[in-house]
């Protein structure tokens, strides 16, 4: 498996993502590589005959539409046979895990609001409408959160962020939940999903 995460500036990979890759590698008894989209240069990797490219991305933004096909082409150019899986946010079991995550929230259902990274109009917007129906709660872009909470001050923010980032930290300071991989149930469920891949 080659996991693809957003990463931080300079290609740094959050510790919770590295720990996830280690746990999956141990359970599968096979190498699990991890790559950050923010890396300035592609990581060196051992020559593997076949790789499953697993985008641990929650939304279908430009990374999903442009960067992932470029990574696949790069790996194919290195002689690997690559299978690119859909982004994590499109997996039905993952959406079920998000529903369970919401149901475990301490906030009353009417106060729950999922806050996500802002996206450009287009396919991402359609996905967000679909996800809002699936989760039965409002989804608000992070850059609109301040306005939203002024209109609905009792709202409880739940960050749609796999690893801690600026958005999740700001929301946590406002009384929101932790990033998804900081939730033991989500972390364990994602490990199980990745271990079950061929």
Give the positions of each predicted feature.
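Active-site-proximal alpha-helix that buttresses catalytic centers in soluble enzyme cores
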Residues: 1-198
């Amino acid at each position: 498996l080659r996991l693809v995460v957003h990463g931080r500036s300079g290609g740094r990979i959050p510790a919770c993502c590295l720990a996830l890759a280690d746990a999956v590698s141990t359970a599968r008894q096979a190498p699990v590589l991890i790559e950050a989209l923010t890396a300035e240069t592609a990581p060196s990797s051992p020559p593997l005959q076949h790789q499953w490219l697993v985008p641990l991305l929650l939304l279908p933004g430009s990374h999903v539409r442009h960067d992932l096909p470029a990574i696949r082409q790069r790996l194919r150019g290195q002689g690997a046979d690559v299978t690119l899986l859909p982004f994590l946010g499109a997996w039905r079991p993952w959406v079920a895990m998000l529903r369970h995550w919401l149901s475990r929230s301490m906030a009353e259902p009417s106060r729950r609001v999922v806050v996500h990274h802002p996206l450009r109009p287009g396919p991402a917007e359609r996905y967000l409408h679909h996800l809002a129906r699936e989760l039965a709660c409002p989804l608000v872009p992070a850059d609109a959160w301040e306005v939203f909470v002024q209109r609905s001050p009792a709202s409880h923010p739940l960050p749609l962020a796999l690893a801690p980032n600026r958005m999740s930290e700001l929301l946590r300071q406002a009384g929101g939940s932790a990033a998804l991989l900081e939730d033991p149930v989500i972390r364990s469920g994602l490990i199980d999903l990745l271990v079950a891949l061929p």
